[in-house]
């Protein structure tokens, strides 16, 4: 069976990364594409299901996993830990399913060190004006918060060249089509096609 591909997807807040990934998943069967389910030490929110939205663990369990080098990447955010399990990810990839990781550039660097075969995609907004409009979309944040989020977005965008692919999300449907094209092209790589069509190739080359 052909090995699945691990996709790293990063973008500044407001670029539409999560919306694009969710739209992609609606067009792909579960046996083809999945989003990685992270481990976290934060408490479940209403409606969240263990193993579906997150794997909820306590701080001691998480630190034990760090000690065992069980994570492809991990980070602390507002006092809670988040991490991507190496074992879980490798098990899914082994079934031929492509796995998407929605992470920032720092997490992407950690994963590249451990799984250099991963493919990475960076998503940019079409302009700073549009990014500012999207960041203000909720209408709940102060000017100070907006300015801070914009500064964080610029810092994130400065790492775009570290990625394999670049998508500019100006028109959502076009950006989604670009994302699908990347996935399709990766599935047609020689390494995957040789595994997928091994029996056919053997018959075609037989005397």
From Swiss-Prot:
Q: EC number(s) in its UniProt entry? A: 2.7.4.8
GO MF terms held by the record: ATP binding; guanylate kinase activity
Q: What is this protein called?
A: Guanylate kinase
Q: In which pathway does it act?
A: Purine metabolism
- Residues annotated as binding ATP are 11-18
The top of its lineage is: Bacteria, Pseudomonadati, Pseudomonadota, Gammaproteobacteria, Enterobacterales
- Give the keywords, sorted: ATP-binding, Cytoplasm, Kinase, Nucleotide-binding, Transferase
Residue ranges of domain Guanylate kinase-like in the record: 4-184
NCBIfam families tied to this protein: guanyl_kin
Q: Where located?
A: Cytoplasm
Family, similarity comment: Belongs to the guanylate kinase family.
Which reaction(s) does its UniProt entry say it catalyses? GMP + ATP = GDP + ADP; dZMP + ATP = dZDP + ADP
Its GO CC terms are: cytosol
Top-tier EC class: transferase
**Record's function text:** Essential for recycling GMP and indirectly, cGMP.
